[in-house]
Amino acid sequence: MNAWNTIYDQFNPIAFSLGSIEVHWYGLAYACAIVVAFYMALRMIQKDPKRFPIERKEFESYFLWAELGIVLGARVGYILIYEPNSSYYLTHFWQIFNPFDSHGNFVGIRGMSYHGGLVGFLIASYLYSRKDLKKLLIYLDLIAISLPLGYVFGRIGNFLNQELVGRIVPKDSHLGQIIGIMVDHQLRYPSQLIEAFLEGVIVFLMVMWAKKHTKTHGLLIVVYGLGYSLMRFIAEFYREPDSQMGVYFLNLSMGQILSLFMVIVSLGILLYATKNSKKIKENQ
């Protein structure tokens, strides 16, 4: 047993308190994720204006729409997919975003679905671009290249919040014994950090490679979608399935099943981008 194995005994998920309001590391990490994604996108606009012909004010307005879509989609997606008492929230819709418990204590909003956030993001992007759909793929590409590094902070936040824990490390796994984290007296994979690396860093490198070697609008979001789906599918083998969900056919988790659907959506965007690529190039 090394110091890393027992790191959860060394810190509190609560960063600090403001009166009765407890500020968690996850909240701070999520705020960092938004800031990183925002400024990464601005840097891309300034560095490559031909690929991203968008004014800063225009992007700022779009970013608000996208972030709102992500938050709404992530929360509603969690309720519909993962929440055992989803029927209660569907009849008490206002409770979905209620950050207070029944005693009036601030507890924050727990339970967000990445894939739900993706759906919300796509819907928000379409609604914002519906008057000028020629820019839709440009917006999507911009988010595709700015989101992965922000995503890293989100998964680090999950790690600091001691949630979305990994599967139990087999006793014969030498590497697992080194990197594992003790959770409830069981050594588990640090799946949140594995996801941060695979779904954040590796996917970012994939999208940057695509940016260098492609010229068609819409391909960056396709590479992001396919790359994330693959990395998430792999990472799920180290992540403990949600207790209320378990596994399904072929022992696949819900995250893996949703990632397969994400592949289908990505291929659909690829068809749309291919069909409209000539028009987009002419309008540059």
Curated annotation (Swiss-Prot):
Subcellular location as annotated: Cell inner membrane
UniProt keyword terms in alphabetical order: Cell inner membrane, Cell membrane, Membrane, Transferase, Transmembrane, Transmembrane helix
Biochemical pathway: Protein modification; lipoprotein biosynthesis (diacylglyceryl transfer)
Chief location category: membrane
GO cellular component terms listed in the entry, alphabetical order: plasma membrane
Transmembrane segments: 21-41, 62-82, 106-126, 136-156, 190-210, 218-238, 252-272
Membrane topology: Multi-pass membrane protein
Entry EC no(s): 2.5.1.145
The organism of origin for this protein: Helicobacter pylori (strain P12)
The keyword Cytoplasm belongs to this UniProt entry's keyword annotation: no
GO biological process, one term: lipoprotein biosynthetic process
Protein name, UniProt field: Phosphatidylglycerol--prolipoprotein diacylglyceryl transferase
Disulphides: none
Function, as annotated: Catalyzes the transfer of the diacylglyceryl group from phosphatidylglycerol to the sulfhydryl group of the N-terminal cysteine of a prolipoprotein, the first step in the formation of mature lipoproteins.
A molecular-function term among this protein's GO annotations: phosphatidylglycerol-prolipoprotein diacylglyceryl transferase activity
Binding site for a 1,2-diacyl-sn-glycero-3-phospho-(1'-sn-glycerol): 155
Entry similarity comment: Belongs to the Lgt family.
